[in-house]
């Protein structure tokens, strides 16, 4: 009996209790890998400023810390897995939202560099913002990494599909009105009893006035300035 007791006690005492949980350690290692990959993805968002990239990375770090705390506080393997999955999903969403911001910045740069009036640019920028908000809503409401990826892809596609006209509708309409006025004036000149030389001199003035108006219209930045130039 004594021998059996001794053997049993020794066997029990010989069982080593690890200082750390293998399940938790593996989950944290996987989480850190996700963080590294996420930050590399942020660095690829070439349209974002350094400050915007850093803000996205800070959000990733914040979500990772919350996940790590949840992993460390988990009582069961299932709890560990859920905490890790939730953390990875949050990080995926951070990357997706930054990708949307990157697409928005690229499209808005295209709009800014166009020949459109301020009002036309504002309307297009608002359209881009609405598409971005819809995309982010879909991303933030996603419950799986696959759904996040889908929402991100659809959002970027919709933003990139925003058409930026090569010509301003307001400016083209103004030029058309000027051209019609010039045509009417030239017809009146042709119908007059002036000499050919006098007609030619007047038509030259019409052409110069039209060219000046067209130039002013091209350089106008607002609808009001376009109207004034017209």
PLM feature spans:
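Amphipathic alpha-helical assembly segments used for oligomerization, scaffolding, or translocation
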Residues: 1-230
């Amino acid at each position: 009996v004594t021998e059996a007791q001794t053997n049993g006690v020794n066997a029990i005492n010989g069982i080593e209790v690890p200082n750390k949980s293998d399940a938790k350690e593996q989950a944290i290692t996987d989480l850190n890998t996700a963080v590294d990959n996420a930050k590399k993805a942020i660095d690829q968002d070439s349209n974002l400023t350094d400050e915007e990239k850093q803000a996205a990375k800070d959000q990733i770090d914040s979500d990772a810390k919350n996940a790590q705390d949840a992993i460390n506080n988990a009582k069961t393997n299932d709890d560990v897995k859920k905490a890790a999955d939730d953390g990875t999903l949050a990080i995926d969403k951070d990357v997706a939202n930054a990708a949307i911001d990157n697409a928005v910045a690229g499209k808005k740069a295209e709009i800014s560099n166009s020949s459109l009036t301020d009002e036309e640019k504002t309307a297009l920028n608002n359209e881009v913002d609405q598409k971005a908000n819809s995309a982010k809503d879909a991303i933030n409401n996603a419950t799986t990494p696959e759904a996040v990826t889908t929402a991100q892809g659809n959002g970027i596609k919709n933003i990139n599909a925003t058409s930026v006209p090569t010509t301003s509708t307001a400016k083209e309409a103004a030029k058309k009105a000027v051209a019609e006025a010039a045509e009417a004036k030239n017809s009146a000149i042709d119908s007059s009893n002036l000499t050919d030389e006098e007609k030619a001199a007047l038509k030259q003035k019409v052409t110069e006035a039209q060219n000046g108006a067209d130039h002013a219209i091209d350089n106008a930045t607002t609808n009001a300035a376009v109207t004034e130039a017209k």
